[in-house]
Swiss-Prot record:
Key words, A-Z: Electron transport, Heme, Iron, Membrane, Metal-binding, Mitochondrion, Mitochondrion inner membrane, Respiratory chain, Transmembrane, Transmembrane helix, Transport, Ubiquinone
Protein name: Cytochrome b
Gene name of the encoded protein: mt-cyb
Other noteworthy facts: Heme 1 (or BL or b562) is low-potential and absorbs at about 562 nm, and heme 2 (or BH or b566) is high-potential and absorbs at about 566 nm.
Binding site for heme b b562: 83, 182
Lineage of source species: Eukaryota, Metazoa, Chordata, Craniata, Vertebrata
Coiled-coil segments: none
TM spans (from-to): 33-53, 77-98, 113-133, 178-198, 226-246, 288-308, 320-340, 347-367
Protein species of origin: Clarias fuscus (Chinese catfish)
Length: 392
């Protein structure tokens, strides 16, 4: 008689996704980040739910309610610190997950990749509206600056901004709707995650050497379930260490001051995980141009599969493209640094050069390197055939 997990309609779905799923035998720890992101999402939803039980989305009490959570609610400070730092770990895992996809050519699974980009946009939107909720100085001014960017939309910009604000400035209506969005969007993220996994399981996972692995598959459980469990332990240990020893390390000191529309902070900046996009936005003097550059800094990922010219899937055996990949990693780090710096010389010009390089790597240099590698590969094959000794 067949096992219940293979026959029961509900258990069968879970079995096919988590237990008997055929996985390539050679996938490395870089393939752990999908499950780590799911763990991060669960941590954020659970901690967020408990925070929402005590938070009040009113400008007169929002800041005080966060203070109340940290001081008076049982383990409220732990929940709050886990939620705030959990967002940072979420983005660390996302960026590593995207980096893995770019390095090993996972973007060639177009449906999975495009849903992934949509997921990134949803998570960024959720994190942005969530950052506004404590109603500190940086929350208020961050919301004002970023929402104000929509005024760059031709014809309807000003109307659009006022519609989002619910008035003529960031006020009570803005905070209330941002809280509603912050509560709702994670459930949209769950739906998109299910689609992401569904499309992935249509094709199966890629592997480090980029070859077809149908001939060498192993079951997900116990091999990769235990491997993922190790990743969970490392991630949770790191999250707990940061949340308990240095909970405010990644935050902004300005957010310890209640929001004041009459006092502008000396330097308005978003959380560290948005700084690379913020640097690209600031590097263009024109407002509409900056907004478009900000949008395309994320949407450029959707173009990557269309610009894949190489005969190989990943970068494992492509030294030129590897150099460009690590240049991109360094470039994003430079942009992150520049995003946190004041708008003055030499940071302006460094940001502009780094922004040009960012788009050049995606749109020009990578396709060019792939084309050149194909030529070198053909040349090598031709020369090896020409020099091969005749068989007697």
């Amino acid at each position: 008689m067949a096992s219940l997990r293979k026959t029961h309609p509900l258990f069968k779905i879970m079995n096919d996704a988590l237990i008997d799923l055929p996985a390539p035998s050679n996938i490395s720890a870089w393939w752990n980040f999908g499950s780590l992101l799911l763990l991060c999402l669960m941590v954020q939803i659970i901690t967020g739910l408990f925070l929402a039980m005590h938070y009040t989305s009113d400008i007169s009490t929002a800041f005080s309610s966060v203070v109340h959570i940290c001081r008076d609610v049982n383990y409220g400070w732990v929940i709050r610190n886990f939620h705030a730092n959990g967002a940072s770990f979420f983005f660390i895992c996302i960026y590593l997950h995207i980096g893995r996809g770019l390095y090993y050519g996972s973007y060639l699974y177009k449906e999975t990749w495009n849903i992934g980009v949509v997921l990134l946009l949803l998570v960024m939107m959720t994190a942005f509206v969530g950052y506004v909720l404590p109603w500190g100085q940086m929350s208020f001014w961050g919301a004002t600056v970023i929402t104000n960017l929509l005024s760059a939309v031709p014809y309807m910009g000003d109307t659009l901004v006022q519609w989002i604000w619910g008035g003529f400035s960031v006020d009570n209506a803005t905070l209330t709707r941002f809280f509603a969005f912050h509560f709702l969007l994670p459930f949209t993220i769950i739906a998109a995650t299910i689609l992401h996994a569904l499309f992935l399981h249509e094709t199966g996972s890629n592997n480090p050497i980029g070859l077809n692995s149908d001939a060498d598959k192993i079951s997900f459980h116990p091999y990769f379930s235990y491997k993922d469990l190790l990743g969970f332990i490392i991630l949770l240990t790191a999250l707990m260490s940061l949340s308990l020893f240095s909970p405010n390390f990644l935050g902004d000191p300005e957010n310890f001051t209640p929001a004041n529309p009459l006092v502008t902070p000396p330097h308005i900046k978003p959380e560290w995980y948005f700084l690379f996009a913020y640097a690209i936005l600031r590097s263009i003097p024109n407002k509409l141009g900056g907004v478009l550059a900000l949008l395309f800094s994320i949407l450029v990922l959707m173009v990557v599969p269309l610009l894949h010219l190489s005969k190989q899937q990943g970068l494992t055996f492509r030294p030129l493209s590897q150099i460009l990949f690590w240049t991109l990693v360094a470039d994003v780090m430079i942009l992150t640094w520049i995003g946190g710096m004041p708008v003055e010389h030499p940071f302006i010009i460094i940001g502009q050069i780094a922004s040009i390089l960012y788009f050049s790597l995606f749109l020009i240099l990578n396709p060019l390197a792939a084309w050149l590698e194909n030529k070198l590969l053909n040349l090598n094959c031709s020369s090896s055939l020409a020099t091969k000794a005749p068989v007697l």
